[in-house]
Amino acid sequence: MSSCLRSALRRVGLLCCLSLALVACATPPINPPITQAALGGGYRLETRPARNADPDNLVILAFSGGGTRAAAFSYGTLEFLRSTEFVSSTGNTGRLIDAVGVITGVSGGSFTALAYGLYGDRLFDEYEHRFLKRDVQGELIKRAATPTHWPSLLSGTWGRSELASELYDEILFGNATFADLQRSQGPMIQVSATDLSTGARFGFNQGMFDILCSDLGQVRLSRAAAASSAVPVVLSPVTMRNHGGSCGWAPPAWTDRFLHSSNPPRPAARAIRSMRALQAFGDGTTRPYLHLVDGGVSDNVGMRGVLDALEVTEALHFVGEPTNIGRSKRIVVFVVNSLSSPPTPWDRSDTPPGAVDIMLKSAGVPIDHFSYESIELLRDISMRWRVMNDIRAKAGANAADPDIVAATQVPPAEIYAIDVSFAALKGDPEFDYLNSLPTSFTLPDEAVD
């Protein structure tokens, strides 16, 4: 064998070894198993410290999807709440942001939610230059185009969303995990993705990970954000290991009151349906892996978790079991909806739009309409509780009809739904500009401002 041939073979061998090494280094992290589901531990609402700015009021923020547009819009809402003072039911003056007990977020809104939960007030000094005014989309494209990343991207198990997760750690989250989030004193942060196989909402909380028999505390926040914003086709799914069935998890005891009823009360029926959808995640034998995509596919305004919690609260109140939410006198929900609906020129031409435009519009229209229905459903629940409480108060002890008594068994809390959206600016010169902003991970600085 000639020296030239030997030299060429060495180079080929070196390249092969380098490629294999790169693939090995790029193996996605695995969410570790737990041997026993412990209902009193981990990152969940029940373990969060009390937010005592006003114990009678529960303030919930729901941050919608929409790329950097959504991240900036939700950040602006936090700035407003930080600068707004209120007088609590105890007579104390405080910042409205300190009364927030829960923040939900999907897709672009998940970044603001997670970052605020991690950093608290420090976010207001750093978020703009670390994320909002950064060309995150451009940086992702550059990384994907770098040859050293190609072997990893071709490995089949380490996709574009894992590449994105690495970037999110570098610029925003600093490898923080949900254990770090649990140690914070802020509100409960609930971000969600969508299970690709079933279309079900997947929430990043220990209750969900109990079903998977896995420890959420060791999952990085960047992976949750990457999963919540993994736009199908554009970004790859984020894969979670399913250890379900190995830690003794069982559905909550309250479900036994309704599972075997042929005619459960309506809120209970919806809550049971949600619980059965969650139970499907617990079969780690036939579903050892879960592939997660953008949370906006199943819930683009971050409201499904809130609605489920209210319906469970109503169902438990019906059977006389109190809940933390049910003890509040007022529940205030800010729906921070960055949905935009820019006009299209299609109706001014006899030529129909192309295949790509049709595909994008077909995917977006059902999501937008479902988002509208979620907000209206919240208002319906608010109205039903108010009316039923009024009827019960007026009937008092004279209500003898058991059906009326049953129908009026709703929590005494008042629900206030506040829609924070671009639609409120219609007629304002800024509306057209904001409504035309793209759903991407880059925005001009003036749009953020």
Regions found by a protein language model. Give the residues of each.
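Bacterial N-terminal signal peptides
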Residues: 12-23
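Catalytic domains of lipid- and phosphate-ester/thioester hydrolases
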Residues: 4-9, 24-449
